[in-house]
Amino acid sequence: MAIALVATYSVTRKSGLDALDACRTSKIMGGSAAIGGPFTLMDENGRLVTDAEVLAKPALVYFGYTYCPDVCPTDAARNAEAVDVLEEQGYEVTPVFISVDANRDTPPVLKEWTDFMHPRMIGLTGTPDQLKAVAQAYKTLYQVPENPVDDTYLVDHMTQTFLMLPGTGFAEIFSHDDSADRVAEKTACFLEATTASN
């Protein structure tokens, strides 16, 4: 069983409300701009892509690995279900899966896994240094065993899903316990607020 690292996020509030504040339940200390940033990674088709390409539309971004026995497939399936619920409401949201297991999650492995989860899910991988950098940008933690005895090792990792919006960046964090309906409802709130503010 994969062990999820536990992190506590401090809840903060600005003195003035922006158009998205009514939808937010939490923020990262330092503000929402503290989450995310530029990256270049390899997608499941073996193509180098940037954050600008991957996050050109609203996205649910999750860090995990395909060999994860329980948490990752559960969360990825939940995110995929939320994306389908949102699509029924007229919203296009991209499910993104960033692997933190550079050794095993090659593009072909990622492609098979993400295609099974959702036809529009984007799988990303990179070198250990690239993955470490993007994980740090998203304030997420993981730990790959340094010298595994075989290919059956587990990777400890956090289980948050990040809602990223074009032109806004980080909007919200969803936990492992949030249902697909909850993720869809909160995401729709942000998308409606973004549309109303434009």
Residue ranges of each PLM-predicted region?
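Short, small/polar residue-rich loop motifs at catalytic or cofactor-binding pockets
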Residues: 34-36, 58, 156-158
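Structural microenvironment flanking redox-active thiols in thiol-disulfide oxidoreductases
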Residues: 74-134
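N-terminal targeting signals for export/organelle localization
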Residues: 1-38, 190-193, 198
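Short active-site neighborhood of thiol/selenol oxidoreductases, capturing the structured segment around
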Residues: 51-75, 79
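Hydrophobic beta-strand anchors of alpha/beta hydrolase catalytic cores
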Residues: 60-61, 95, 161
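Thiol/disulfide oxidoreductase modules built on the thioredoxin-like
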Residues: 130-186
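A short beta-strand-turn-helix
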Residues: 39-59, 83
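Short acidic-hydrophobic, aromatic-tinged amphipathic segments that line or gate anion-handling sites
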Residues: 42, 122-126, 143
